[in-house]
Amino acid sequence: MAKTASSPLASAPRLTELLASAEPLTLDERRQIVRQAQVLIEQLFVHLPLKRAMHAVDPVQRLHLLDRRLEGFSDRRFHDEMISIFIGLRDLHTNYILPLPFAGKTATLPFRIEACWEGDTRRYLVSGVAEGLDLPPFGLGVEVTHWGGIPIERAVALNGERNAGSNVDARHARGLITLTQRPM
């Protein structure tokens, strides 16, 4: 959808603009972030023993290994690894937040999807559409059966694995929400 002056998305920055404005982190800045994360998780995160046992994760070791491999990482790969380490904790209160210009930004599609039940079958329907989005037959109430070529149920489950949430239902809820609204 093209942005127009009347569109509510008109003032939203494009991802390409955001990426172009990002300053890469120096090696020292990356090391500082990793070391701060090590202190946070190893010395302050009281649920670490529980999370290790429940989810078979070792974020302290992953951070140690990341620290040793930092020189070969792009910013994108570094941030992806940090996000993965924190998501592995499956703790909604412990997150890795991207630096500026991404901090506080959300990538958003101009519609929402919600799940509902029809008998024993879960269905996914478009439940909200941004003002000005007119793409018939797409609109409110349309059933979504696939996402990026993947059956929607599987797409939601895969997306849920990329989100914090310590049980299947929490991951499903986060996976569904973040299909169309993804914090950067």
Could you describe each region identified by the protein language model?
Residues 1-184:
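Flexible, low-complexity junctional segments that flank or bridge functional domains
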